[in-house]
């Protein structure tokens, strides 16, 4: 089967990019590809044949129909207007046309210098490409909207960061790479007609049902806000901290995008800061809902030339509604509740307080809670708490709440185990795979990818364990 590519972005938004070709790496070679995703997309196996070199995965060749461009956008970084940004090391190669008429961006990260590289070198390093591949696939299998990873290429090209590292490329796929920052770019250049063209493009291709509706722009922004609210709710319930929620890293489609200094909670710490460059804690875990709203407000400002203020405010209210509704639903599922009762939040907050005091592992606590039996006061979770009396008091109230519903243990446990993962991508697991890969051993990278495909399956090995001492509080930066 021949892959078919289109160039809608290039054809319809000529002011938003620079056309250019990738710059290949020295002795590039494919070290991992997503076989499951490749099969779903009917990508010929021959394209992954190492005897053909790095091929499209290393920017050495293009597939028929590809028209590569680097996109320009701007944004607020750490709450401050940063001006023009853009694809400083990534190139949108083309948009794969799928059988249902939708498209999928093929975006090559680490593809070389672009007009938007600023002081950078246009390269990505092996460490960061591995982290993004693992994170995006982990999020996908957790059921959270995200970009996807298709391939990783390593090379003999040295790249200087804090130390000398190995140049690499990641093929990232997404329904769209349209960002809040695209709209900000033209708004601050005083080109509102181009802001509206971006909105028209989004509606035409992603919300075509509203093309002929008078209030199409208001409806569209309301849906952007709602998708963002649901996404942030998913992050909070699974314990994911993005680390760098700048407006240029926010997806119009409500996807998790641009994995840099991210982290999943180990110990439950609502003030967890994943990015060691975030000295003020702007992007700490418990501040993500507020930051997302602030980012939506910046996007709303760009839309004022063609959406009324009242409609924009209604959409921002929709964000809050979507966030709280989805978060509440997800947390009730995590606790095994099938109905909503007035004291549920009290019970949840009491558990969070206990976990924070004791430094309980976020993922393991909820997974172990999934094995609760209503009539039994014994629980393996009890042994993880030092203050047993406090846990016992909470656990009694929790089991009493479970008994208010006529749901048997087996059904409830089944629901809980579908939403409380046994496996998340802990930073130490990613680092172990990176350390091995940098020594030329890709086995752990492949093994970890396989493990992350089954996050809701219990395991008795170290993939499901708390981090070892060396793996606690690993510092992660924006350097990639």
Curated annotation (Swiss-Prot):
Enzyme class: transferase
An example molecular function term from Gene Ontology annotations: ATP binding
InterPro entries on file: adnlytase_SelO, SelO
Pfam families to which the protein is assigned, alphabetical: SelO (PF02696)
Enzyme active site: 248 (proton acceptor)
Signal peptide: none
Catalytic activities: L-seryl-[protein] + ATP = 3-O-(5'-adenylyl)-L-seryl-[protein] + diphosphate; L-threonyl-[protein] + ATP = 3-O-(5'-adenylyl)-L-threonyl-[protein] + diphosphate; L-tyrosyl-[protein] + ATP = O-(5'-adenylyl)-L-tyrosyl-[protein] + diphosphate; L-histidyl-[protein] + UTP = N(tele)-(5'-uridylyl)-L-histidyl-[protein] + diphosphate
Cofactor(s) required, per the database record: Mg(2+); Mn(2+)
Enzyme nomenclature, EC number: 2.7.7.-, 2.7.7.108
Domain of life per record: Bacteria
Nucleotidyltransferase listed as a keyword: yes
Alphabetical UniProt keywords: ATP-binding, Magnesium, Manganese, Metal-binding, Nucleotide-binding, Nucleotidyltransferase, Transferase
Binding site for Mg(2+): 249, 258
Keyword flag Metal-binding: yes
Binding site for ATP: 86, 88-89, 109, 121-122, 172, 179, 258
HAMAP family, alphabetized: YdiU_SelO
Function text: Nucleotidyltransferase involved in the post-translational modification of proteins. It can catalyze the addition of adenosine monophosphate (AMP) or uridine monophosphate (UMP) to a protein, resulting in modifications known as AMPylation and UMPylation.
Stated family: Belongs to the SELO family.
Protein name: Protein nucleotidyltransferase YdiU
Organism for this UniProt entry: Salmonella paratyphi A (strain AKU_12601)
């Amino acid at each position: 089967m021949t892959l078919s590519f289109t160039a809608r972005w290039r054809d319809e938004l000529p002011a938003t990019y620079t056309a250019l070709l990738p710059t290949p790496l020295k002795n590039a070679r494919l070290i991992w590809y997503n076989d499951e995703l490749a099969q779903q997309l009917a990508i010929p196996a021959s394209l992954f044949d190492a005897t053909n070199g790095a091929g499209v995965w290393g920017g050495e060749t293009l597939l028929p129909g590809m028209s590569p461009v680097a996109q320009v956008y701007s944004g607020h970084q750490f709450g401050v207007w940063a001006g023009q940004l853009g694809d400083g090391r990534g190139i949108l190669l083309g948009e794969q046309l799928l059988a249902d008429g939708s498209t999928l961006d093929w975006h090559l990260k680490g593809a070389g210098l672009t007009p938007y590289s600023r002081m950078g070198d246009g390269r990505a390093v092996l460490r960061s490409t591995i982290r993004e591949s693992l994170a995006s696939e982990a999020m996908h299998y957790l059921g959270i909207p995200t970009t996807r990873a298709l391939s990783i290429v390593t090379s003999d090209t040295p790249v200087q960061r804090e130390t000398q590292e190995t140049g690499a490329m990641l093929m990232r796929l997404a329904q769209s790479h349209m960002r809040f920052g695209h709209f900000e770019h033209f708004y601050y250049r005083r080109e509102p007609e181009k802001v509206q063209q971006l909105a028209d493009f989004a509606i035409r291709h992603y919300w075509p049902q509203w093309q002929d509706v008078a209030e199409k722009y208001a409806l569209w922004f309301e849906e952007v806000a709602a998708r963002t609210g649901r996404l942030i709710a998913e992050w909070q319930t699974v314990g994911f901290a993005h680390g760098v929620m700048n407006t240029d890293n926010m997806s119009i489609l409500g996807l998790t995008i641009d994995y840099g200094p991210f982290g999943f909670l180990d110990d439950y710490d609502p003030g967890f800061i994943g990015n060691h460059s975030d000295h003020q804690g702007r992007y700490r875990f418990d501040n993500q809902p507020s930051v997302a709203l602030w980012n939506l407000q910046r996007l709303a400002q760009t839309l004022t030339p063609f959406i009324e203020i009242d409609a924009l405010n209604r959409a921002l209210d929709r964000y809050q509604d979507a966030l709280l509704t989805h978060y509440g639903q997800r947390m009730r599922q995590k606790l095994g509740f099938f109905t909503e009762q007035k004291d549920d939040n009290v019970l949840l907050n009491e558990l969070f307080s206990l976990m924070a005091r004791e430094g309980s592992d976020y993922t393991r606590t909820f997974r172990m809670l999934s094995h609760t039996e209503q009539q039994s006061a014994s629980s393996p979770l009890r042994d993880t708490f030092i203050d047993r009396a406090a846990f016992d008091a909470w656990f009694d109230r929790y089991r009493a709440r479970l008994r208010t519903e006529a749901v048997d243990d087996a059904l409830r446990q089944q629901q809980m185990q579908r939403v409380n993962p046994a496996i998340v991508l802990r930073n130490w697991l990613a680092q172990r795979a990176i350390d091995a890969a940098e020594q030329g051993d890709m086995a752990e990278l492949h093994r970890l990818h396989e493990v992350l495909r089954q996050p809701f399956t219990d395991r008795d090995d170290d993939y499901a364990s708390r981090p070892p001492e060396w793996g606690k509080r690993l510092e992660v930066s924006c350097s990639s």
